Amino acid sequence: MSFADTLRQLSSAEDFFSALHVDYDPQILNVARLHILRKMRLYLEADKGDLADESLQKQQYQHYLAQAYNDFVHSSPIKERLFKVHQEAVKPVKLPMVKLTSLTMPPE
């Protein structure tokens, strides 16, 4: 069976990590599974390398899956904004801190 055929049979994020021999923390994967796979796909699309050799192709997929996973170890799905719902969400506005000493009580 070819590497491409093997990938087509995978049905979960855990399957991809297992097939590509990439270690992961289940807690991180439970939160960001779709985001990680999408980010991996974006990395693969950006790389215009030759994928004729299956061993090189597997190494490339393994590298980009590990890189995408690592992105979400240090970030979050909301910060990465890969999906439309996150891209269109309003970024939270950082409000300036107000010192407690500047607050006054209203007159009675």
Curated annotation (Swiss-Prot):
Keywords: Nitrogen fixation. It comes from the Bacteria. Pfam families: NifW (PF03206). GO terms for biological process: nitrogen fixation. May protect the nitrogenase Fe-Mo protein from oxidative damage. Belongs to the NifW family. Homotrimer; associates with NifD. This is Nitrogenase-stabilizing/protective protein NifW. The lineage of its organism: Bacteria, Pseudomonadati, Pseudomonadota, Alphaproteobacteria, Sphingomonadales.
